[in-house]
Amino acid sequence: MARRISMATRTELVEAIIERYRSSCRADKQRILDEFVAVTGYHRKHAIRVLRPSESEPPCARQYAVRYGPEVREALVALWEASDRLCSKRLKPLIPILLPALERHGRLDLSTELRDKLLTVSAATMDRLLSEIRVVARGGQRRRAGMSSAVRRSVPVRTFGDWNDPLPGYVEVDFVAHSGTSSSGSFVQTMVLTDIATGWTECVPVRTRESGLVIAALNQARSLFPFPLQGVDFDNDSAFMNERVVCWCRSQGLEVTRSRAYRKNDQAWVEQKNGAIVRRLVGYGRLVGAEATAALGRLYDVVRLYGNLFQPSFKLREKTRIGARVVKRYHPPVPPIARGGCPFRCGRGR
């Protein structure tokens, strides 16, 4: 039956008949319920829930007995420290070996019951019991920030939209790995430096990613550009983001910036040259050793002036969005030497 009375009236009706309903016998309850459903329009099951006695107190949560108390936790801490703070999954198979040794040397004095608990405790339970002591051992940090992280935080971020037509001398720097199909072991890498204003690009081979060799390659590249370098923009590679390299760049008067992590478009200029120059010229093979490094350097000596003096390239002038379509307009293609009025100073010294 459709509801014919208001909510306030239904509430008053419940208050009027609820005590009589609860104190009646089964037959009378059925008759009262029929009348109540007919008047209010409630579903019969809902009417029963409204009229039946409410529980005086909610059911209490189930209480579980504590199996691994503080004495188990203290013994686990001793085992954890003795194992050089291993994770629980590695510590569990080591407990049968460590436990007799610690008891033999007086570090632990355990009852048979406590000893059995330590031998049967699961790795997940060990994680829960050791969670607080692990936070204290870390000094309250989730993980320790290394020196490279501190150096990275000290270097300001520069995105692809922050350049605003700089003067010649601000370069993006990146590594191209000549590792072939395997990145294991030591292999030659090419340091690529691309000037933002002119597109002038220099490539310097590096035998390993050691910071001293990185500094030597940067210093060598400075002598190859036809204008003085003003700033370097690195990615977040640890070969660049370390105290030695960053401090050297700043001591040379170079402005040091970095791109955002996992945002390759922040270094779009040098990323384009990685493929257009290095990969196109050298390919994807594996190069190893001093002899390969020297040969690669001689190759770059031959092609550097050809690309920078005679190879015209496009440079974006403006970009306009029209609905879902992006329209790009470019300056007329010219070689890097013709951009920015850069004076030609042929540097050597590779």
From Swiss-Prot:
Disulfide bonds: none
Entry-linked SUPFAM superfamilies: Ribonuclease H-like
Positions of the Integrase catalytic domain: 164-327
Signal sequence bounds: none
Keywords from the named record: Plasmid
One GO BP: DNA integration
Gene Ontology molecular-function annotations: nucleic acid binding
Record protein name field: Uncharacterized protein y4rM
Organism the protein comes from: Sinorhizobium fredii (strain NBRC 101917 / NGR234)
